[in-house]
Amino acid sequence: MAYVRLFDNPEGTQEQYDAASERLGVTAETMPEGGVLHVAGPSPTGGWRVVEVWESEDAARKFDEETLLPLLQSVGVERPEAQTWPVHNLVVR
């Protein structure tokens, strides 16, 4: 079952996001295994927001443990807690 994660980082900045993204090197062609969708931008309440859709919770957890968390630590960003929920419907053009 597909799985959504929403990260709201009140102290997050575009510069931090761009630094982490550059090191990850993820594009539509290199999306991590199990990744479906990744969207990021400024939060309406300030800071930075990221929304991800994964094929499963296990795929997201594997990416976190093996790739994302070590990278965020290396650029000095603490990963905020995620709001998560199962996907009922996903429409992509």
Question: What spans do the regions from the language model cover?
Answer:
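Short S/T/G/P-rich N-terminal loop/turn motif that feeds into the first structured element of a domain
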Residues: 1-66, 70, 76-93
